[in-house]
Amino acid sequence: MPTVATSSNRETVDKYWLAVNARDWDSLAKLLDPDYVWEMPQSGERVRGEQSNREMNDNYPAGLPDIETHRITGSEDRWVTTPSWTVLKITGTGDDYVSESRVSYPDGSVWHAVDMFHFRDGKIRSQVAYFAPTLEAAEWRARWVERF
């Protein structure tokens, strides 16, 4: 089995987010293992393979989120706007990396996303993504916590 330098996997995560933002599915495909799997446990969904991933992203209702373009699509009774997606931090070592992101929707809601990447032979073998809205802090903890 080939050995992959840690920095190469980190660079691949950077390239992943750049390719997603650019909608460059050909470049993204080069980063994915042939057995790529993307899981979203909160909704109980699994995407198998690069082609399914490509087709799903091509059919995102308002286009994929980014920080440059905000498209609005919809019909008379349903409108979908594209959120802004900001990668805040990427950490990891070896074959496991995690990215933390902040997603801001046009309605003012803010969500947080965590994507866990696992590598095999320098390619992204699997990805697990968690999404959660911002929550109000519980009052009972106020005297022990610091708000940020």
Regions found by a protein language model. Give the residues of each.
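C-terminal and inter-domain tail/linker signature
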Residues: 1-148
